[in-house]
Amino acid sequence: MERLKKRPDFLRAAKGIRRVTPAITLEVCETPALAAKPGVLRVGFTASRKIGGAVQRNRAKRRLRAAAAAVLPLSGLPGNDYVLVARRDTLTRPFGGLLDDLVSALNAAHARLGRPTA
């Protein structure tokens, strides 16, 4: 699992499929450049100032990184870019609920792509 760090990668993902849950907004796009690297998916994390100050934004991103590390190796599809956008509930939702939100968003996005999660 690689990280998205460049702005154009985030903008491309924003033009893809978007699924909103109480704690997470998931943006997914297929990336043809990753086809040459089998088994690779990329993930990025964002938290805007609507979440709160720097401490709250950093905490939200840490929670998103932990959720992605737990879920994406099992449910993510290679060849896709995933961007997890923090919402206000990211900070207060129990971690199990955060994981459930991510799994449901992934399943919905993959169904929309025509590549359901196994």
Question: What does each of the following model-derived ranges do?
Answer:
Residues 1-118:
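Positively charged, solvent-exposed patches that mediate nucleic-acid binding
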